[in-house]
């Protein structure tokens, strides 16, 4: 990771999946059958009803309630003992054990059983909710095909594990099946369902020679793919790894609740002890039973699980909702960060535009005799060494005129190609030294271009040959269809300012900004210039919110690292950019940035609401219990009810997709 990356990657692995107060909820991946979890509660409930309605042992009224207590009480007694043995005395199990034993001691047998019964019911539903949220997050594992069909040189088919397929192998994918590994499409143009990766419902057409990502579904026909990279480095595996890691990267709210619970639990136990002891002592040793009962009510309602379960559950839910839309947050902390965004900065090419350039006009300088077609071929020979969209367009244009590697008679090969970062390339072609790129590249080598403009095309590639200006190539690029809507949605969400940073010429960037409704633009920027502009923007809005940068992953890693929240657009972006980014948008739809902000804001609002709701109800019942206005029944129902209500609230998080 870039050492300039100021983002906080807070990991917290203690009490994973539990409360932080010692509340280790049982939502392992291999959950027990439902009947096994419900049976002890059903037995306890039946015996409790028998004890209340028609106790068969009037001489020993406590006996039936002890029997009712055991099915739900023994597991909690065991958990309490295990936590105490680990040195964690102040945990929710200790609270429940103290409260119920105290209730038995003062003869409140039905309440003692009811406390653990309702507590167990609440735990059951909380565990199921957490388990469901975890399954949502881990559902991408189901996208992984179990086998791949490898085609050998003789055309024979062999079913093997995707992990066993080697780079260069040819695999076959049947219609309706998922592509198991990243590769190059060998079949003619085919359609693929990419919804599982990008969240986009529209099928995507891919041409022969273009890349196909693992996890896509072939539509309508059998296709063959040449494997580009091993399974461990495939797009699907990268997505699964990011989503699984996100579940363990805690938000600030989650870590605060964990720390709060560690202090809160011993404090409420101490307060309960004071309620039980101080008033009777001040009254001359009378009223012990009354004040002990009030202390027990205080203990029961004080259990912090409504907070310590619902808060991480809300972040699990937010990450899960986003992942189904092809928006991959690398942790709950970034849900918080996007909720506080006030400025969004975009790269231009490949992010707000399609990045699919088309060569429009090739112009030779006066006195250059090689001709436009030959100049294009020579420039393409150098540009073959680059992966930039402009370079690919020039190569494609030259190839369409017969300059292909398969046509050795007409193909040109460049030697000694070197990149001058942010400016272009230099190399030797057919004995000529070529400089290819921005006008600034040629000017840096003492060549005057005159910055000749043309009315066609948005982007200019200048060429110098043997120390002289040779000509230029004009290329056109189009805004993405969703870009204007994406900018409009950001403004509607209250984003104060949008901005474009680009290395393209001013006229092209200004035209795009005006077309899309972007507030601010900066052009002719080198990579370090983008970083400087990002620093300036962050300083300007330091007191008003956070700044996001959205890039397609090509040469964007430094500015992604400088931003408060980095969005990598398109899951096929560079590894460095995807590694540096905090949020990866699998599709090329800029409107997904607005969706991410909506999910982040709804998650944050829900967390705040749940915290206020839980604390408000608990404090009210604590005071009522201490003053004698709340019973153990009220305490346990309030505790269980608020916990389940907070859990249910987490399912209010929706995508807000438009």
Model-flagged regions — what are they?
Residues 1-32:
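Histidine-centered metal-binding segments
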Residues 51, 55, 59-147, 151, ...:
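Actuator/coupling domain of P-type ATPases
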Residues 28-43, 264:
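N-terminal membrane topogenic signal
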Residues 431, 465-609:
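Conserved ATP-binding TGD loop and adjacent catalytic N/P-domain core of P-type ATPases
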Residues 359-497, 506, 515-534:
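P-type ATPase nucleotide-binding
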Residues 541-544, 581, 586-658:
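Membrane-embedded transport module
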Residues 93, 97, 146, 197, ...:
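Conserved catalytic phosphorylation-site environment of P-type ATPases
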């Amino acid at each position: 990771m870039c050492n300039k990356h100021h983002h906080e990657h807070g990991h917290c692995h203690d009490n994973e999946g539990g409360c932080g107060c010692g509340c280790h909820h049982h939502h392992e991946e291999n959950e027990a059958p439902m009947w096994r979890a419900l049976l002890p509660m059903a037995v306890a409930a039946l015996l409790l009803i028998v004890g209340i309605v028609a106790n068969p042992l009037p001489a020993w009224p406590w006996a039936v309630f002890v029997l009712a207590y055991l099915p739900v009480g023994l597991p909690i007694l065991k958990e309490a003992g295990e936590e105490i043995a680990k040195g964690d005395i102040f945990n929710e199990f200790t609270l429940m054990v103290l409260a119920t034993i105290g209730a038995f001691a003062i003869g409140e047998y039905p309440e003692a059983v009811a406390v653990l019964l309702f507590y167990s019911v609440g735990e059951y539903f909380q565990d199921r909710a957490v388990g469901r949220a975890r399954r949502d997050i881990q559902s991408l594992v189901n996208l992984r095909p179990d086998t791949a069909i490898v085609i050998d040189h003789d055309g024979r088919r062999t079913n093997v594990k995707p992990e066993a397929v080697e780079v260069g192998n040819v695999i076959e994918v049947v219609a309706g099946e998922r592509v198991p590994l990243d590769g190059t499409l060998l079949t003619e143009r085919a359609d693929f369902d990419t919804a599982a990766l990008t969240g986009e419902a529209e099928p995507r057409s891919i041409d022969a020679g273009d890349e196909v990502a693992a996890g896509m579904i072939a539509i309508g026909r059998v296709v063959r793919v040449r494997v580009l990279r091993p399974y461990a480095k495939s797009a699907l595996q990268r997505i699964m790894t990011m989503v699984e890691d996100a579940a363990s990267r805690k938000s600030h709210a989650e870590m605060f609740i964990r720390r709060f619970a560690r202090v809160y639990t011993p404090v409420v136990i101490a307060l309960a002890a004071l309620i039980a002891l101080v008033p009777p002592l001040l009254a001359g040793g009378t009223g012990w039973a009354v004040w002990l009962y009030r202390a027990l009510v205080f203990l029961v309602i004080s259990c912090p699980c409504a907070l310590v379960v619902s808060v991480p559950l809300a972040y699990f839910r937010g990450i899960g909702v986003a992942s189904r839309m092809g928006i991959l947050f690398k942790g709950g902390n970034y849900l918080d960060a996007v909720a506080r965004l006030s400025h969004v900065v975009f790269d231009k090419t490949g992010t707000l535009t399609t990045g699919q350039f088309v060569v429009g006009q090739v112009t030779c300088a006066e006195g250059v005799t090689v001709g436009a077609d030959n100049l294009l071929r020579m420039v393409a020979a150098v540009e073959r060494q680059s992966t930039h969209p402009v370079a690919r367009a020039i190569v494609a244009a030259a190839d369409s005129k017969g300059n292909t590697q398969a046509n050795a008679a007409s193909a040109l090969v460049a030697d000694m190609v070197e990149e001058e970062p942010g400016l272009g390339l230099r190399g030797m072609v057919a004995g000529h030294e070529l400089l290819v790129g921005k006008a600034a590249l040629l000017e840096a080598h003492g060549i005057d271009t005159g910055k000749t403009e043309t009315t066609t095309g948005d982007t200019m590639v200048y060429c110098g040959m043997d120390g002289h200006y040779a000509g230029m190539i004009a290329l056109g690029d189009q805004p993405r269809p969703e870009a204007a809507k994406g900018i409009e949605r950001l403004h509607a969400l209250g984003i104060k300012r949008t901005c474009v940073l680009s290395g393209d010429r001013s006229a092209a960037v200004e035209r795009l900004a005006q077309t899309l409704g972007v507030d601010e633009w900066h052009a002719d920027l080198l990579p370090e210039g983008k970083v400087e502009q990002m620093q300036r923007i962050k300083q300007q809005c330091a007191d008003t919110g956070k700044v996001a940068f959205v890039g397609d992953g090509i040469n964007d890693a430094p500015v992604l690292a400088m931003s408060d929240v980095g969005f990598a657009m398109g899951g096929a972006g560079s590894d460095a950019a995807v590694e540096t980014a905090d949020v990866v948008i699998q599709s090329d739809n800029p409107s997904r940035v607005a969706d991410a902000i909506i999910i982040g804001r709804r998650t944050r609002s829900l967390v705040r609401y749940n915290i206020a709701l839980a604390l408000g109800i608990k404090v009210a019942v604590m005071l009522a219990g201490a003053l004698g206005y709340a019973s153990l029944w009220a305490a346990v129902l309030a505790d269980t009810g608020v916990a389940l209500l907070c859990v249910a609230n987490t399912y209010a998080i929706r995508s807000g997709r438009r």
